[in-house]
């Protein structure tokens, strides 16, 4: 074999050894997206529900941001608030699409990044729907979760690999008796959850987590080429909110400013009030946030606020299965309540 042919052969072999594993990994990831996006997953572009295409003439597009309550944890994508809201508005003969950009564990800090990531959807109005995931109110450890940005592939291309998350959530389901929310609580608070899974389930979960770690390792290698800036909230005290809500308020204000600067309308929504002492804290948080909005933006016509705090009684098991996340009927109530404010804001 001539030196030239030998080099060609070596180059081809190296190319195959690199391309083939990535192609196989991509094919497996696309399969997992297809399998899980209709239940508890997301599509290849990182949002829940069907992929939306170029906005049509006369169509209004709405996006909904938030954490697991907006995402629709525990229900199908059709039963989540965004899909039901779309159906409510369309039933009046209006052309509208509502895209679910929420993600489990995310709080107000993520809003600005998500609004930016999905500008290409050409949305007209953004609904900001999250307070629960910022109730810790600890300025030393705010909720900096921006789940999609943990993937260098998403940051570079907009494609969100799902297989590490699917494997990790499957493992968590085995360890936490089917309650993957405990995994996210542990990630958010740092408090370890004691579980009593069987040895067999622990072994299976360990294997799944090991597989997820392989995917994470590949992404970390890619991440070295496009490192993510260290998360921070600039000048939280500028929000004017009292302790411990300054970081939360500033994150909401930052998102609203970003949206207005890009010609978007924004609807900020208070979620159903939590029960007991958590509810008292939730109401205090929301009152501080609303006051900050009014101080900063006054009578801005492209911004509206809606209080859905009393729309759903979270102690009613027919409407909420865990006193936080809603059942399909609970989500339907919120969607019905939001339809009017959304239509009014789109008409401005």
Roles of regions detected by a PLM:
Residues 1-63, 75-76, 94, 109, ...:
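N-terminal secretory targeting modules
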Residues 248, 319-348:
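Histidine-centered active-site loop/cap adjacent to the catalytic His
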Residues 45-104, 112-127, 331-332:
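Serine-esterase "nucleophile elbow" of acetyl-processing enzymes
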Residues 133-294, 313-317:
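Serine-dependent acyl-ester chemistry module
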Residues 78, 82, 86, 108, ...:
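Extracytoplasmic/secreted envelope proteins and their assembly/folding machinery
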Residues 31, 179, 191-193, 338-348:
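Short, hydrophobic alpha-helical segments
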Residues 288-306:
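Structural recognition of alpha->loop->beta junctions
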């Amino acid at each position: 074999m001539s030196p030239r042919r030998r080099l060609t052969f070596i180059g081809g072999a190296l190319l195959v050894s690199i391309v083939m594993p990535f192609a196989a990994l991509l094919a497996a990831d696309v399969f997992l997206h297809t399998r899980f996006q209709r239940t508890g997953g997301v599509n290849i572009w990182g949002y829940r529900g069907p992929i939306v295409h170029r906005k049509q003439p006369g169509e209004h597009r709405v996006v909904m941001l938030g954490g697991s309550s907006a995402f629709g944890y525990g229900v199908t994508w059709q039963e989540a608030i965004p899909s039901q809201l779309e159906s409510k508005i369309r039933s009046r003969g209006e052309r509208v699409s509502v895209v679910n950009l929420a993600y489990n564990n995310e709080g107000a800090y993520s809003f600005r990044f998500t609004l930016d990531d999905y500008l290409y959807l050409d949305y007209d109005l953004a609904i900001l729907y999250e307070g629960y995931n910022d109730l810790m109110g600890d300025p030393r450890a705010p909720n900096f979760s921006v789940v999609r940005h943990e993937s260098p592939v998403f940051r570079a291309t907009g494609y969100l690999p799902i297989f590490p998350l699917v494997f990790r959530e499957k493992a968590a389901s085995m360890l936490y008796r089917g309650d993957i929310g405990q995994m996210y609580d542990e990630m958010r608070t740092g408090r370890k959850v004691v579980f009593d899974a069987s040895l067999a389930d622990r072994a299976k979960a360990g294997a799944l987590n090991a597989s997820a770690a392989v995917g994470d390792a590949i992404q970390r290698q890619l991440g070295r080429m496009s490192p993510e800036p260290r998360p921070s909230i600039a000048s939280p005290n500028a929000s004017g909110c009292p302790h411990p809500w300054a970081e939360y308020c500033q994150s909401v204000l930052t998102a609203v400013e970003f949206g207005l600067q890009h010609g978007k309308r924004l609807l900020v929504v208070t979620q159903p009030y939590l029960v007991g002492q958590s509810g008292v804290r939730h109401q205090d948080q929301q009152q501080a946030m609303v006051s900050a909005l009014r101080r900063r933006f006054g009578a801005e016509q492209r911004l509206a606020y809606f209080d859905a705090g009393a729309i759903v009684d979270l102690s009613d098991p027919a409407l909420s299965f865990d006193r936080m996340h809603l059942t399909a009927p609970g989500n339907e109530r919120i969607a019905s309540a939001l339809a009017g404010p959304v239509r009014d804001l789109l008409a401005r």
